[in-house]
Amino acid sequence: MKDKKKYWKELKEVCEFLSKRKADTLHNAGGHIHVGACTLGDDLDAWKNFIKLYTVYEHILSRFFHGDKFTARKRILEFAEPVAPILYNRIDAFNSSSTVRSLKWKFPCMDRCLSLNLCNVDFHKPMCNDKKNTIEFRWPNASSNHVIWQNNINTCTKMLNLSKNLDTDFLDYKLSNGNFTYDKMKYSEVNIEEALEFVDLVFDNDLDKVYFLRQYIKNYEENFKINKAVMAKTFVR
């Protein structure tokens, strides 16, 4: 898929097809996003920047990726385990990498069932356009709403593109002073301050920021006791 009108139209048509047939997106259905690893390619600094960005804001992305639900799907931890705690513990090793190829060995977290799956990345030929050479975001819930898919795709691609020209001083500060253990409440609650930090870093226009924040906030609905996906009140037109 490319950022062209015809592809977005096809996406909308697929979602409408699923909606008409009442496709079940509540029970363990994931909406994984694959983005070509060639977006970062052989740019070592871009890879380092992206990992830092993802590590710092995984808890913000998690609520956003719940999509039109305000909770995660039931078996999320089984098939998309939060990866920020693992990445955080390997930051120093990652920073010492001198080539993109060496990243594969500096980060021994190559498990497909993590929220960020790097198993498909060809670290030996990161510029190749092979459709299998992808970075996979596994946290998103499935949805039959095309706007949710558009928002998710836009966020993932903007994160990767931004990483090629990102000043990481602020992220380094966050990494030095934050707590990156997994906590269900942290990954589900509304945190406006850090959500605003994220959108100001990642997006270069107000419309993208509004779409992200609207999907992230979801009428401020929160419930930390529910262990399954629950539809949020309508916030997407």
Show where each model-derived region lies.
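C-terminal accessory/tail domains of diverse enzymes
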Residues: 1-24, 38-237
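Short, conserved phosphate-binding/catalytic loop or strand-edge motifs used
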Residues: 29-31, 35
